[in-house]
Curated annotation (Swiss-Prot):
Annotated protein name in UniProt: Tyrosine recombinase XerC
PROSITE patterns: CB (PS51900), TYR_RECOMBINASE (PS51898)
Domain of life of the organism encoding this protein: Bacteria
Source species: Pelotomaculum thermopropionicum (strain DSM 13744 / JCM 10971 / SI)
Subcellular location: Cytoplasm
Annotated NCBIfam families: PRK00283.1, recomb_XerC
Domain Tyr recombinase: 111-298
UniProtKB keywords: Cell cycle, Cell division, Chromosome partition, Cytoplasm, DNA integration, DNA recombination, DNA-binding
Assembly mode: Forms a cyclic heterotetrameric complex composed of two molecules of XerC and two molecules of XerD.
Active-site residues annotated for this sequence: 151, 175, 250, 253, 276, 285
The protein's role, per its UniProt record: Site-specific tyrosine recombinase, which acts by catalyzing the cutting and rejoining of the recombining DNA molecules. The XerC-XerD complex is essential to convert dimers of the bacterial chromosome into monomers to permit their segregation at cell division. It also contributes to the segregational stability of plasmids.
Chain ranges of the Core-binding (CB) domain: 1-90
Sample GO molecular function, one term: tyrosine-based site-specific recombinase activity
């Protein structure tokens, strides 16, 4: 089984352009299942072949995870990893049939995306001290994240060449290497101009390697800023402005979509700006805005009270 899993991970990296984090997640979930199947079948894990695992064993696996008290989302994710793996095995003609076609995934509760209100988003992105180089960088970073509705992985990958500051556009490389052009508002452009002119050269001077680094956002050592580094920066300013709930970089992306729809943007345009392949991925934000409007109605309309 290990050979097939290794080949599948290569397929994800090379053909599906999956990120290292994604392939690592798949590997972890597949190995978790493999440990259970080895125990269930009374075999060494390296001796298991795909045909050893039928739909009954997959159902036992689900029951086992349920007994462990795992969240439905965790169970569904692990099963989804095995679904993808077995679809790959079937396409490669390694198995004759897919046993997971007979296994239902756990039903998940639909959770609405968390977002910031407009005044909260404004307070957060304006929190950095722009008198300092790192503050200039942080302001530009937060403005770009919010103004462009970027995923954290997209922000990390931005290079200087992706930014057309004069036109106010940024080229974003999304999932599966799909590119899109995203407009930036005047505030994001101003923050980026200040960062590029005054702060980035000083951060670049700190580079130990003394090599040209094309990354748009740099850390204090003049290296490309990592996803972990961006999360730390966001956490710092969330604490500074005392937002009393959990905020992630994706919260700013959710806020971007919600605020556009609240202001009357059409769904197709928001879909394109966010880089969603399916409209259904964008439609979830209409539920968010719908819930907000419902609360306003119930609070304000005389016939809704009581």
């Amino acid at each position: 089984m290990y050979v097939h899993i290794d080949n599948f991970l290569v397929y994800l990296r090379v053909e599906k352009n999956a990120s290292p984090r994604t392939t690592e997640s798949y590997q972890k979930d597949l190995f978790h299942g493999l440990d259970y199947f080895a125990s269930r079948l009374g075999k060494e894990d390296h001796a298991i072949v795909p045909s050893d695992i039928d739909h009954r064993i997959f159902r036992h696996y689900l029951a086992h995870m349920q007994k462990q008290g795992l969240a439905r989302a965790t169970m569904a994710r692990r099963l989804a990893a095995w679904r993808s793996f077995y679809r790959y095995l079937y396409r490669e003609k390694i198995i004759d049939g897919n046993p997971l076609l007979r296994v239902a995934s756990p039903k998940l509760e639909k959770r609405l995306p968390r977002f910031l209100y407009e005044d909260e988003a404004k307070e957060l992105v304006e929190a950095p001290d722009t008198k300092q180089p790192l503050g200039m960088r942080d302001r530009a970073l937060l403005e770009t994240l919010y103004a462009g509705g970027l995923r954290i992985s997209e922000l990390v990958l931005l290079d200087l060449g992706d930014l057309d500051i004069s036109s106010g556009y940024i080229r974003v490389t999304g999932k599966r290497a799909r590119e899109r052009l995203v407009p930036l508002g005047s505030m994001a452009v101003e923050a980026l101009q200040a960062y590029l002119a005054k702060a980035r050269p000083r951060l670049m001077a700190n580079s130990v390697a003394k090599k040209i680094n094309n990354a748009l956002f740099l850390n204090c050592r003049g290296e490309r800023l990592s996803a972990r580094g961006i999360r730390k920066i966001l956490d710092k300013y969330v604490e500074k402005v005392s937002l009393e709930r959990k905020i992630s970089p994706h919260t700013l992306r959710h806020s971007f979509a919600t605020h556009l729809l609240n202001a009357g943007a059409d769904l197709r345009s928001v879909q394109e700006l966010m880089g969603h392949v399916r409209l259904s991925s964008t439609q979830v934000y209409t539920h968010v805005t719908g819930e907000r409007l419902k609360k306003v109605y119930r609070k304000s309309h005389p016939r809704a009270k009581g």
